[in-house]
């Protein structure tokens, strides 16, 4: 029996799947902001969530065959981690806003709002899930970087200078931008 398309995950790797799930959960939480605060916070939060998932997907698509591949993949994973840190900071700012009036964040199917205590509990549960997802993503990215380092050291590549690394990164960056 096959899995329906809407239930399929984009990849079989944990760090890619977790990035996708994290992006989805962050966007759901950001959509709970009121219209006034959504104009300020929602677009950057959605952008950072998408960027961190995109960088993970790009890094996943690189199979390490050469020094260039290793450097590019490492750079993409570090950019994903940087976007993850910025996303976490921005999301915490938005969460402070949500906690100022939690009853307006969630509404029932009939359109009425939850009480403040119910809404606070719902927000706490959602934040707990997000916190574990963030921690897991940090751990997974660190694990991928460590395993890439081990593979790189096993292959015994020639020592490459910092200038060559910069040239490789700049060329790959512009190649990614113009594709």
Spell out what each predicted region is:
Residues 1-179:
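Amphipathic alpha-helical assembly/interaction segments
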């Amino acid at each position: 029996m096959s899995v329906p398309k809407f239930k399929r995950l984009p990849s079989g790797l944990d760090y890619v799947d977790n990035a996708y799930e994290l992006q989805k959960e962050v966007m759901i939480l950001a959509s709970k902001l009121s219209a006034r605060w959504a104009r300020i916070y929602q677009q950057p939060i959605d952008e950072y969530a998408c960027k961190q998932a995109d960088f993970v997907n790009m890094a996943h698509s690189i199979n390490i065959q050469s020094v260039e591949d290793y450097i590019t993949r490492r750079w993409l994973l570090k950019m994903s981690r940087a976007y993850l840190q910025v996303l976490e900071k921005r999301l915490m700012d938005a969460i402070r806003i949500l906690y100022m009036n939690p009853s307006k964040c969630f509404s029932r199917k009939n359109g009425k709002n939850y009480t403040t205590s119910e809404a606070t509990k719902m927000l706490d549960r959602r934040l707990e899930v997000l916190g574990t997802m963030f921690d897991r993503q940090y751990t997974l990215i660190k694990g991928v970087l460590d395993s890439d380092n081990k593979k790189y050291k096993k292959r015994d590549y020639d020592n490459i200078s910092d200038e060559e690394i910069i040239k490789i990164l700049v060329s790959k960056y512009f190649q990614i931008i113009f594709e």
